[in-house]
């Protein structure tokens, strides 16, 4: 999958669509300027969206995909994990019993499971958007201000394990260019 992702960059000039990973550069795309890559946009003018010919019918631009709620729940889960680790480290240093440690783990794991279930409900709510083309905020290393064409694509993560329609078309254009 990494090879295919990197192939997308090298062969078709595709941008990274992820935004939550730590990268060595910030503000890679200047605000207010439309990126050149075919698969991300600053959405300066929704009426001239660069992939408008591929938009799915009935999809709002920008496309609500539960981003804020997903991010908030994911952050809560990370916080609970961090709190659990700190608590368990503290208990171990204090010489707590295995039973006490086990009970604390059980309590934190239940909190995590509850938050994951909440997150899963949000994911399910927006599942109808899978495979659709819209303008999904969060792309090009930026959580806000840049948009990608689909909820998931090989340029965003390895979950979808395929390129979205916009990226497929960009690759197709390059194949046609090099074979003519």
Regions found by a protein language model. Give the residues of each.
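Active-site recognition of the HExxH zinc-binding catalytic motif
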Residues: 1-17
């Amino acid at each position: 999958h990494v090879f295919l992702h990197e192939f997308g960059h090298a062969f078709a000039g595709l941008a990274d669509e992820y935004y939550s990973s730590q990268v060595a550069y910030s503000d890679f795309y200047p605000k207010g300027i439309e990126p050149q890559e075919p698969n991300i946009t600053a959405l300066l003018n929704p009426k001239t969206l660069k992939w408008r010919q591929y938009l799915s019918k009935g999809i709002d631009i920008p496309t609500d995909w539960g981003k804020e709620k997903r991010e908030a729940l994911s952050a809560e889960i990370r916080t609970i994990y961090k709190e659990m680790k700190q608590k368990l480290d503290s208990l171990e240093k204090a010489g707590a019993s295995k039973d006490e440690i086990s009970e604390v783990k059980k309590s934190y794991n239940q909190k995590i499971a509850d938050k994951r279930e909440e997150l899963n409900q949000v994911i399910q709510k927006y599942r109808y958007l899978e495979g659709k083309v819209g303008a999904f905020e969060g792309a090009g290393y930026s959580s806000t201000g840049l948009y990608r064409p689909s909820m998931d694509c090989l340029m965003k993560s390895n979950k979808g394990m395929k390129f979205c329609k916009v990226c497929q078309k960009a690759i197709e254009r390059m194949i046609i260019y090099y074979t003519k």
